Amino acid sequence: MQSRLLPSGPGRRWISLRVPNTPQRRAFASTRFLFQDVFQSQLDDPSSAALFSSLQSSRAVPQTLTEKIVQKYAVGLPDGKFVKSGDYVTIAPHRIMTHDNSWPVALKFMSIGASKMHDPNQVVMTLDHDVQNKTEKNLQKYRQIEEFAKQHGVEFYPAGRGIGHQIMVEEGFAWPGTLVVASDSHSNTYGAVASVGTPIVRTDAASIWATGKTWWQIPPVAKVTFTGILPPGVTGKDVIVALCGLFDKDDVLNHAIEFTGSEETMRSLPMDSRLTIANMTTEWGALSGLFPMDGVLKGWLKGKATTAAMGLADGPFKTLAARNFTHPAIEQLFVNPLTADKGAKYAKELFLDLSTLSPYVSGPNSVKIATPLKELEAQDIKVDKAYLVSCTNSRASDIAAAAKVFKDAAEKNGGKVPKIADGVKFYIAAASIPEQLAAEGAGDWQTLLEAGATALPAGCGPCIGLGTGLLEPGEVGISASNRNFKGRMGSTEAKAYLGSPEIVAASALSGKLSGPGWYQPPEGWTEVVRGEGDGIREEDRMLNTEQALEKLLGQLDDLVADGEKRFAPEEKVEEEGGLTEVYPGFPERVSGEIVFCDADNLNTDAIYPGYWTYQDNVPVEKMAEVCMSNYDKEFASIAKEGDILVVGYNFGCGSSREQAATALLAKQIPLVVSGSFGNIFSRNSINNALMGLEVPRLVSRLREEFGDKQLTRRTGWTLTWDVRRSQIEIQEGQNGPKWTHKVGELPPNVQEIIAKGGLEKWVKNAIEA
């Protein structure tokens, strides 16, 4: 047991409270720090007392950096409202990017009766996914998108110019301190430049085009602290591959991440490393990956401004860098850079000691499998194809790292660049034309071509399983891209690994999974140090008065919250003044029999088969028939109209297909209850007027009662959702117990979208009004 100081009474007497010992630092456990790092002299100092009072008042609405940025782009807020995690807000993002899916979005846009863009300056269109496809059908789609963009006066980038996310960053559309969205899951990339980048779905995009806004629920925010210094031979790709594999229990699923660290630590992560890390926070399960507005970012921005001012960014394709990157704008940006408030609340805190990291490889066929390169090298894994492609790792610096592998080998080969290994095919595609031109100017692009690499146009290509060079059955591939799940880059019978550009190049050169040998482990190294908390050892923590008191307040808040949870009744169903307003046309109560599908991570392909996804005009009856058929072919006959579907955790993960929601509506299921939802499924559900609730307790109770697993089960239980009271009532069979449980509030602005029949109809109604 240890003593902690607690304030008591109006005069703030200090009393001692006996609490259990808590480890100050251990992996995957709380590392909240004890009160003994607040010295009594600090508490007795009159100036400290005044500071203590000011800190109390300033902590009324402390916000994370994510919340601060969202606050800037939230519209229609009540006066004095400070947004926080969990809030449903209407957002008017700084920019929105669509790519090859621009035409389906345009069809939605026109179907709701929209005739002009709300704000053409808000919109950017890029063609990047299927750029190798020269069929007339695809070229016609590309022409339609370009004509539509010209008609509405929006920024347009043609096929071959580069990958949309790279364009958004290099052209300055993703700008520090802004909220930027895209109809693509790797919108997280923009977090590298201190922009909250997050994905939306096509209906959202049509809504923003037409009205300038859509809805968003602010995710829980996780703080990830980097400590130490990234060693030579270790890259940003190794950092994010390690994070995905070492924190592999959905630690940040559906969270917004804020990366932080000391100035020295963050200097060891250059901008291209940050772009890689932010990009793959998507694979880690997060909805955004935000880096701070710091000196590294400022230096990069000023470099872009200088390059643009000198005209060095000019080339065969247009660039807006000279307009968007200017030294006065950058200086103004950093006069008062946005930072998280002291006392901001985070849903969780994790840390990774960069100095203990070595080169890592992801796979095969899963980002949750991360293995030190050294272990895989010992296995002599033959490689058939290598890929230096994608918005993750195909910038000029990445191409330079890959070229250095061959240049180093050339020094041992009489100056002659060696060829890639027999039987290996090596594909390269720059993230954008400016990046390729920079690589050509340095001679790095030519080095890779001389080694035998096959150049592909700037675009997504093999990363998403399109075009030349896909993996065949039985083949092994190593890629610098971001996803390696089975079948992503070709055959489901192939094995795909992910690694840094130098690992890709070294593997292409040797013919087996290997690295260039640039990394040397430090003396005494044993393992990667990571865990919960901020990872700073107490003996290294120097606290001034303000830091100490700020820490104390945070600990008091946590202690009070823990006490409230510990001594509060198990269920507190009704609170005075806590009733939710019900929007006209939205049901006050929803009730039905529970059908239970006892499975976690049911993806959208399990809900609505891919075979039907790209077939137009599928009858509603057919959608109902195939709903959940990839999960359980008996679902169609077991589930009935009006049933309430209860499922496990992370329901609706995977692709962004809207039919995963509309097929359940076709089956006439009004409400889905889960332990948790995949974020994109949640968006599609609300956008298509399918109601959903997250109730982990109900999932646990069903699993307790029905231990013998069935894919789909009629339970005989009933669920009634009281929308006004934000509670559910469960009747466990005719003669079983009845219990109630509080659920998250569904606010009127979201009810309105559902009551109108979905976001498209809501937008149409808004346009007509």
From Swiss-Prot:
Disulfide bonds: none annotated. Belongs to the aconitase/IPM isomerase family. Its EC number is 4.2.1.36. NCBIfam families: h_aconitase. GO terms for biological process: lysine biosynthetic process via aminoadipic acid. Coiled coil: none annotated. Its cofactor is [4Fe-4S] cluster. GO terms for molecular function: 4 iron, 4 sulfur cluster binding; homoaconitate hydratase activity; metal ion binding. [4Fe-4S] cluster binds at residues 391, 460, 463. InterPro entries: Acnase/IPM_dHydase_lsu_aba_1/3, Acoase/IPM_deHydtase_lsu_aba, Aconitase/3IPM_dehydase_swvl, Aconitase_4Fe-4S_BS, Aconitase_4Fe-4S_dom, AconitaseA/IPMdHydase_ssu_swvl, Homoaconitase_mito, Homoaconitase_swivel. Catalyzes the reversible hydration of cis-homoaconitate to (2R,3S)-homoisocitrate, a step in the alpha-aminoadipate pathway for lysine biosynthesis. This is Homoaconitase, mitochondrial. It comes from the Eukaryota. The gene is lysA. It is found in: Mitochondrion. Pathway: Amino-acid biosynthesis; L-lysine biosynthesis via AAA pathway; L-alpha-aminoadipate from 2-oxoglutarate: step 3/5. Binds 1 [4Fe-4S] cluster per subunit. It holds the Pfam family Aconitase. It catalyses: (2R,3S)-homoisocitrate = cis-homoaconitate + H2O. Keywords: Amino-acid biosynthesis, Iron, Iron-sulfur, Lyase, Lysine biosynthesis, Metal-binding, Mitochondrion, Transit peptide. Residues 1-28 form a transit peptide. GO terms for cellular component: mitochondrial matrix.
